[in-house]
A protein has these predicted regions:
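Bacterial N-terminal signal peptides that target proteins for export
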Residues: 1-7
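Bacterial N-terminal signal peptides
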Residues: 7-16
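N-terminal active-site segment of His-dependent metallophosphoesterases
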Residues: 19-96, 195, 218, 224
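Extended active-site neighborhood of metal-dependent phosphoesterases/phosphodiesterases
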Residues: 25, 49-51, 85-212, 229-243, ...
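Alpha/beta-hydrolase fold active-site loops
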Residues: 36, 74, 178-179, 212-214
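Short acidic, glycine-rich surface-loop motifs adjacent to enzyme active sites
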Residues: 208-224
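A short C-terminal boundary segment appended to hydrolase-like catalytic domains
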Residues: 285-344
């Protein structure tokens, strides 16, 4: 009798635990129709406490790796504010790389011999399970000291071979899938002293091969006066980008734009915090104060080809999930579908 009672209690406990456990996230696997996949997040490099990765950054990084395991991506894009509060400093390079880059994004990094020797213990995922991707980064407004720029450009790749800082101040990466990624330093181009660099942005967009054009910068175009020179430079190119990937605002957003500005702005600024400004972007369709990340897929070919844009919310109280999704056609037509919300 006692044995039966113990078995019954154990069974009920297992059922209770099973009922309390949140459902597993379900995302479709990457199908053959997906020609290119990019993951994106920004504003992630919060200062470690006692050398430990901040909990919010770690949660987002783990969700990012889980999404890549389900549907492998082709590149991970960091949209700035990589190292708070004043960028990367020479006296703490290895500590910051250990806690802010190699540890949380272990799934994606490729360590050099030097990186493996000095930081390898921070990368806990077995090497056989990792999926190193190109790590393409732009500067944020917290990264702009001369020391940090030099360290992010030259020192980080000595430890992490697949890290590359782009957009100093403008740089284009042409991908074989017909996607032109135009990276630019929005903090620098906001400054009147750097006005002479704005034609570089015009030229880069005008000369991009396309037909798909994605701008990558830290700041979204949020209607401020400081954005006007950048908007004029984009308009002068004579070709329109379908997408601007940005961060800076510490939340998740989507906004449609009017020609000749980018057809859509996808804000993925929740890599390490969710201190949303709650201000509204021009053409805003969605806003969620949550940590998380974004995914961009190029789907299909010919007349049916489109960009599929998704925002993933990550929190301490819920499983990571898609909360908003849109498609953007080659001509810039936007179709939206809001899937839900999540609390941080």
């Amino acid at each position: 009798m006692m044995h039966r009672q113990i078995v019954l209690v154990a069974t009920l406990l297992a059922l209770a635990i099973g009922c309390a456990r949140p459902p597993e996230p379900r995302y479709e696997a990457r199908g053959a129709e997906v020609r290119l996949s990019l993951l994106a997040l920004g504003d992630w490099g919060r200062r470690p406490k006692e050398g430990q990765t901040p909990a919010k950054q770690l949660r987002v990084a783990e969700a990012l790796a889980a999404e890549d395991r389900r549907a492998p991506a082709d590149a991970l894009i960091f949209v700035g504010d990589n190292f708070y509060p004043h960028g990367l400093e020479a006296s703490e390079v290895e500590m910051r790389l250990r806690a802010n880059l190699v540890g949380p994004y272990c799934h994606f990094v490729a360590l050099t011999a030097r990186g493996a020797a000095t930081l390898g213990e921070a990368c806990l995922e077995p090497e056989a399970r990792r999926h190193p991707l190109p790590l393409w980064a732009v500067l944020g407004n917290h990264d702009t000291s001369a020391e940090s720029i030099a360290l992010e450009r030259e020192r980080v790749p000595l430890y992490v071979s697949n890290w590359k800082l782009l957009g100093l101040p403008v740089e284009t990466v042409e991908l074989p899938q017909g996607v032109s990624l135009v990276f630019y330093d929005s903090t620098a181009l906001h400054r009147t002293a750097n006005a002479a660099s704005l034609p570089l942005l015009t030229r880069a967009l005008a000369q991009s091969r396309g037909p798909w054009r994605v701008l990558v910068a830290h700041h979204p175009l949020d209607g401020r006066e400081v954005d006007v020179p950048i908007q004029r430079a984009l308009a002068a190119a004579g070709v329109r980008a379908q997408l601007l990937l940005a961060g800076h605002i510490h939340d998740l957003r989507g906004a449609a734009g009017e020609a000749p500005q980018p057809a859509f702005q996808l804000v993925s600024g929740g890599g390490g915090g969710s201190e949303s400004s709650h201000q509204t972007l021009p053409g805003e369709l969605y806003q969620l104060a949550s940590t998380g990340f974004a995914r961009v897929d190029l789907v299909g070919a010919g007349a049916s080809a489109h960009l599929r844009l998704r925002l993933f919310a990550v929190s301490a109280v819920d499983v990571p999930r898609v909360v908003a999704a849109w498609t953007v056609s080659e001509s810039g037509a936007v179709t939206s579908e809001t899937l839900g919300s999540a609390a941080e």
